[in-house]
Amino acid sequence: MTSDKHLFVLIHGLWGNYTHMESMRTILSTTLKKEDVNDDMIYFLPKQNAMFKTFDGIEIIGYRTLIEVCEFIRDYKDGKITKLSVMGYSQGGLVARFMIGKMLTEFKELFEDIEPQLFITMATPHLGVEFYNPTGIAYKSALYSALRTLGSTILGKSGREMFIANSSNNILVKLSQGEYLEALSLFKWRIAFANVKNDRTVAFYTAFITDCDPFIDFDNKLKYTFEEKIPGSGYKGILPKIVDLNALNVNSHAPTKPTKTYKKWGRTILIILVATFLILPIALVMNGLGTAYSYIVTCKYRKMLSNGILHNEVRGKLGLTEQLKGYVTDAYGSIINSALDMDANYEASNSNLVNEEELPWKEFIQKYTTINDGVWKSKFKKLPFDENRKVILRNLNKLKWIRVPIYIKAVNAHGVIVARRGMDENTAATGIACIEFTAQLLAYLMHKSN
């Protein structure tokens, strides 16, 4: 006799592919099995939105992902799927929010007997992407202006949507309303992980869903205070470094690093020169080509979206008309390899910490469900949000979230938060600890839900 199953969908981010979520799946599977909640778990990593396809905009990416999930559920024969959890990494968190909105409305008959459980985002720009410069440093203002223009241009429809460039690219506002917000509210738990530093793609405030960012406010010079008692056990290396926001002190700055040697300066300058004159031009050309190609091949689907008929087409045979299926199966080709990711890591200190006194999960969850109303916010200025971001923030804050401010010591914390390049001896220990903590938190919540 087959048992009821819990489907866990893991969705990758911009410029990525499904392998970016393999490390997370591995740790989840191992941890949940150890906690006796893995027997009925099945994991699904959508594969049809790789590389340039992530430029196509949230709606088209979301429909493609929904098609894959629908087909998987339709064809699954080893039991009845009765529960659903979703994890989205970076842009994948936005795609996930679109997907569940359509899943529980336009495809309600397929999902009406499936109970939403956990919804998790890892470094997701819920409030879009915007660069703020409260310190007023002139070169940063010029740099941010250039990055804003580039980001909303060379990243295709997705880039314009991330920056909420205009009223025709306001999908992030829509995702905070109506069917999307209602679907999100049906999940028993919503969890948002946010990097406090070293994430050059998604700033803390937008991943944490807040209008206050101490790390931008003080140009990342604040001294961090970490939670001393971390729930969970069996961490292989160090404990995860979760920042105690309420303990941040505006008068306590991180110690200044010693002056670099000439050798280190030379190496840094060499890296900058290589990035500026070799990697950046290649990336710009490839992104430009990807943007152009994305615009051409998705034009007809955008017309279907604007005419309100795409969802009807998708519904046919679980969403596969010949036109759309042709697009879903069309391959752009991977012409940029992972070497351009530049995801070098540093080893963290304190590699043999022992979690001698565990903080009960209940206490941790209570604190970090209400952390956005904590005393820390009174110490720092509000960011100057435009009206769109104010609306998104207000709507998303109607729901309860467990928000985790995580510190990862790595050059590219954005990639390491899910170990998207895999886990080996070179993976930052703080990144592995973050993934282990995530898995243990989810295991506890699943136990609690049961």
Curated annotation (Swiss-Prot):
EC number(s) per entry: 3.1.-.-, 3.1.1.4
Keywords, comma-separated and alphabetical: Hydrolase, Lipid degradation, Lipid droplet, Lipid metabolism, Membrane, Transmembrane, Transmembrane helix
Active site per database record: 90
Bilayer-crossing regions: 269-289
General function of this protein: Phospholipase involved in maintaining the lipid droplet morphology. Has phospholipase activity with broad substrate specificity, acting on glycerophospholipids phosphatidylethanolamine (PE), phosphatidic acid (PA), phosphatidycholine (PC) and phosphatidylserine (PS), primarily at sn-2 position. It can later remove fatty acids from the sn-1 position of the produced lysophospholipids such as lysophosphatidylethanolamine (LPE). Also shows activity toward phosphatidylglycerol, but, in contrast to what was observed with the other phospholipids tested, prefers the sn-1 position.
Protein species of origin: Saccharomyces cerevisiae (strain ATCC 204508 / S288c)
Keyword Hydrolase: yes
Gene Ontology CC annotations of this record: endoplasmic reticulum; lipid droplet; membrane
UniProt GO molecular function: lysophospholipase activity; monoacylglycerol lipase activity; phospholipase A2 activity
Consequence of gene disruption: Leads to an altered morphology of lipid droplets with a smaller size.
Catalytic activity: a 1,2-diacyl-sn-glycero-3-phosphoethanolamine + H2O = a 1-acyl-sn-glycero-3-phosphoethanolamine + a fatty acid + H(+); a 1-acyl-sn-glycero-3-phosphoethanolamine + H2O = sn-glycero-3-phosphoethanolamine + a fatty acid + H(+); a 1,2-diacyl-sn-glycero-3-phosphate + H2O = a 1-acyl-sn-glycero-3-phosphate + a fatty acid + H(+); a 1,2-diacyl-sn-glycero-3-phosphocholine + H2O = a 1-acyl-sn-glycero-3-phosphocholine + a fatty acid + H(+)
Further remark: Present with 1210 molecules/cell in log phase SD medium.
UniProt record similarity statement: Belongs to the putative lipase ROG1 family.
Induction line: Expression is up-regulated by the transcription factor RPN4.
Name of the molecule in the record: Lipid droplet phospholipase 1
Pfam families: DUF676 (PF05057)
UniProt GO BP: lipid catabolic process; lipid homeostasis; lipid metabolic process
Motif extent (Lipase-specific GXSXG motif): 88-92
Broad EC category: hydrolase
Membrane topology type: Single-pass membrane protein
Subcellular location: Lipid droplet; Membrane
Domain of life: Eukaryota
